[in-house]
Amino acid sequence: KDFNNIGGAAVLMDVKSGEILSLISLPDYDLNKRYSLDSNIYTNKITLGVYELGSVFKTFTVAAGLENKLINPNTVFQNLENKLTCDKYTISEHDKLPKDLNTEQILIRSSNIGAVRIAQKIGIEKYKNFLNSLKILQKIKFDLHEVGDPTAFNWGKCKLATASFGHGITTTPLQ
């Protein structure tokens, strides 16, 4: 209500077993008023909605760097610019950040440029392999029939850069 949101979704999961205990997708609907409703409300946003995850995806970029032993929490990235250009795209920071940040600070301060630098260190193949090992880029199997497909794309240096901070790479909230 405070933000005038028109929809949302949430999943309650058992962290030990991975079992889905509950999921909700809003807005919901009243079947007594089904003829006066927008058809979009019948979409389960958890399983069928495909979205860019944005800055949440930086955790996967950092995890890929840690998993491949290319970074640690204290690895310092020096001379981070507040914006960089990749082909026709400009990547920038939301806020002005210090020029030197370690891995932990990149996550805490949500640095787009820091995430790009980590992804560049990882490289396309290792990054793709890491995401595939988590099945983030694949359609999931689930008890409900309505499950969305992550959007396929061609990898390149700019896709690696934007994917590192969750842009241009899509998946369902359930994934």
Regions found by a protein language model. Give the residues of each.
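Short, basic/aromatic recognition patches
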Residues: 1-4, 46
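Beta-lactam-recognizing serine transpeptidase/beta-lactamase-like catalytic domain environment
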Residues: 8-55, 60-175
